[in-house]
Amino acid sequence: MSCCKVPVLIEAQVEMVSANELENKSLFRQEEDATQTKEASLMEQGSLSTSFPQHTPKAPKNSVLNSIKIVIFCNKLNLLLPFGPLAILVHYMIDSKGWVFLLTLVGITPLAERLGYATEQLACYTGPTVGGLLNATFGNVTELIISIFALKNGMIRVVQLTLLGSILSNMLLVLGCAFFCGGLVFYQKDQVFDKGIATVNSGLLLMAVMGILFPAVLHYTHSEVHAGSSELALSRFSSCIMLIAYAAYLFFQLKSQSNSYSPLDEESNQNEETSAEDEDPEISKWEAIIWLSILTAWVSLLSGYLVDAIEGASVSWNIPIAFISTILLPIVGNAAEHAGAIMFAMKDKLDLSLGVAIGSSIQISMFAVPFCVVIGWMMGQQMDLNFQLFETAMLFITVIVVAFFLQEGSSNYFKGLMLILCYLIVAASFFVHEDPHQDGI
């Protein structure tokens, strides 16, 4: 019996050993598979990091003379810079308001473009969040400076019409020219853009229309609780709400949904590296800050002469102040954005064109307009959001038309032509419109 039990025990031990070996092999294979998976993921991350390298801007080593050369002499538009000092000379020697206004208007044009350039250079060193705030602040600094000078002089209607004209110009003329030029270059197809972003922007513009529409309706229906004061109180309250909404929009754009607002290039890795190299700043951070200060001071100086000459230019040229404030001034302030939007559209980067045109309209309607109401509140000026019935209706119809054109998420040269023709109708309407506040107040 004992002899029979020995082989059985041996067989049991052999089976146990083989089972242990199988378990060890399976564990070893699992560890090996996990190691290979980790290595593969690391290799994939490494390949991604090499394909899309983190680009850090390299500060150029410029001298003062080289910085002056880059900012002043490397842009053909700066050939118009001498018109600014010439306007000041004409003001003191001839005192012709019409010529002072015209020369100042031309002299401010390159300064507005250089302000945008200096802002972009400084944004290269600050990162996307602060850079976005800089662009939001200095993107329409020319209109803000002109508006503050006019507000200081009590010319509330000039402030309202200038800001309104800038919104209309960006939505119709700038966007229309971008659609038209981009459509001519790519005439065989419809250019596409992000429909979701366009919907959010249209909603913000409609909110701005709401803030401007209700004080006008309250005024013309004579339904104020306290005549004269309820309209102003509503405007100031709505302005604070609009500023909060704009701050939330900036957070949404720069933080919460930053990926949606920074579309990736659909080109190859080589184009990605090329675009990263193009974003390297041309001047240093402190040079950009100094140039921003100089250009802002120069724009402020010329804006004072410009505002003083508006009424005289209107009389000498026999042109309504409403047309000068709504059409001529915004075209100068939007000159840089106009060129940038067209350039992006001709490169089939329509999201950037919309960011320039519609984004600037949002900045003015949701930031500049309520900001001027708050500044006027501090100055003791009774600026409100009642832009009068004609102007408010013009803004409302324009926003509806633009939102209708953006709802499909595509554009062509015909849509651009329609927007340009709409702007011509707006310009003609303001040319024959008699402003009830002829004194600018």
Swiss-Prot record:
Keywords: Antiport, Calcium, Calcium transport, Ion transport, Membrane, Transmembrane, Transmembrane helix, Transport, Vacuole
Residue ranges, Extracellular side: 91-97, 151-166, 218-231, 308-311, 376-384, 434-441
MF (Gene Ontology): calcium:proton antiporter activity
Similarity annotation: Belongs to the Ca(2+):cation antiporter (CaCA) (TC 2.A.19) family. Cation/proton exchanger (CAX) subfamily.
GO BP of this protein: calcium ion transport
Annotated protein name in UniProt: Vacuolar cation/proton exchanger 2
Physiological role: Vacuolar cation/proton exchanger (CAX). Translocates Ca(2+) and other metal ions into vacuoles using the proton gradient formed by H(+)-ATPase and H(+)-pyrophosphatase.
Species: Arabidopsis thaliana
NCBIfam families per record: caca2, cax
Record field: pH dependence: Optimum pH is 7.0 for cytosolic pH.
Alphabetized InterPro entries for the sequence: CaH_exchang (IPR004713), CAX-like (IPR004798), NaCa_Exmemb (IPR004837), NCX_ion-bd_dom_sf (IPR044880)
Stretches the record annotates as Cation selection: 139-174, 333-368
Transmembrane segments: 70-90, 98-118, 130-150, 167-187, 197-217, 232-252, 287-307, 312-332, 355-375, 385-405, 413-433
PANTHER family, A to Z: VACUOLAR CALCIUM ION TRANSPORTER, VACUOLAR CATION_PROTON EXCHANGER 2
